[in-house]
Amino acid sequence: MAVQALREELDSKCLQLLSDLEELEAKRAALNARVEEGWLSLAKARYAMGAKSVGPLQYASRMEPQVCVRASEAQDGPQTFRVIKADAQTPEEVGPSEASLRRRKGPTKTKELGSAVVPQDPLNWFGILVPHSLRQAQASFRDGLQLAADIASLQTRINWGQSQLRGLQKKLKELDPGPA
């Protein structure tokens, strides 16, 4: 009876793995489409604004990331990747930065605790009125970044599923030395 349950679990893991592989193929195709669309929109913007108006000379001297990729690992599962805004605070960072007494009446000019620099939209590097194709390129690359994080999570889930599948096959071979 244990062999039959093990075979059923092996079948379900195999079906899950095939489903994940199919999803991975679809997401990779979507990522390729987003990146291709982004480069095409960027080329259209360069044509509309001129080659010298859209290039490395317009980049900010100090670039700040707008998003970060955060990896989180479950205790009993594979690692997952999420795209989050760079200025979003984690729960550990929320709250007062230091405990102190407040003065009710005192100097009116106080040091601001939350004076963090808000990341500027990179489209503003190229002027105030940018072509729509440049905005489309930014949106395509942003969507591509989310898809890349999804693909990385899916790939780790597939690798984790493959290792589980190998473990189940090994168990089955130990319990039932006949044809598997």
Curated annotation (Swiss-Prot):
Q: Which domain of life is it from?
A: Eukaryota
Q: Where are the transmembrane segments?
A: none
Q: Which UniProt keywords apply?
A: Coiled coil, Cytoplasmic vesicle, Endoplasmic reticulum, Endosome, Lysosome
Q: In which tissues is it expressed?
A: Predominantly expressed in the heart, liver, kidney and testis and at lower levels in the brain and lung. Undetectable in the spleen and muscles.
- Which stretches are annotated as coiled coil? 4-38
Keyword flag Endoplasmic reticulum: yes
Induction per the UniProt record: Modestly up-regulated by FGF2.
Against InterPro entries, the record matches this protein to: Vma22/CCDC115
Give the species this sequence originates from.
Mus musculus
Q: Where in the cell is it found?
A: Endosome; Lysosome; Endoplasmic reticulum-Golgi intermediate compartment; Cytoplasmic vesicle, COPI-coated vesicle
Q: Which lineage do the record's taxonomy fields give for this organism?
A: Eukaryota, Metazoa, Chordata, Craniata, Vertebrata
What this chain does, per the entry, is described as: Accessory component of the proton-transporting vacuolar (V)-ATPase protein pump involved in intracellular iron homeostasis. In aerobic conditions, required for intracellular iron homeostasis, thus triggering the activity of Fe(2+) prolyl hydroxylase (PHD) enzymes, and leading to HIF1A hydroxylation and subsequent proteasomal degradation. Necessary for endolysosomal acidification and lysosomal degradation. May be involved in Golgi homeostasis.
Keyword Plastid recorded: no
Annotated Gene Ontology cellular component terms: COPI-coated vesicle; endoplasmic reticulum; endoplasmic reticulum-Golgi intermediate compartment; endosome; lysosome; vacuolar proton-transporting V-type ATPase complex
State the name under which the record lists this protein.
Vacuolar ATPase assembly protein VMA22
Looking at the record, which segments are called Disordered?
Answer: 90-113
Q: What binding partners and quaternary form does the record give? A: Accessory component of the multisubunit proton-transporting vacuolar (V)-ATPase protein pump.
Picking any one GO biological process from the record gives: lysosomal protein catabolic process
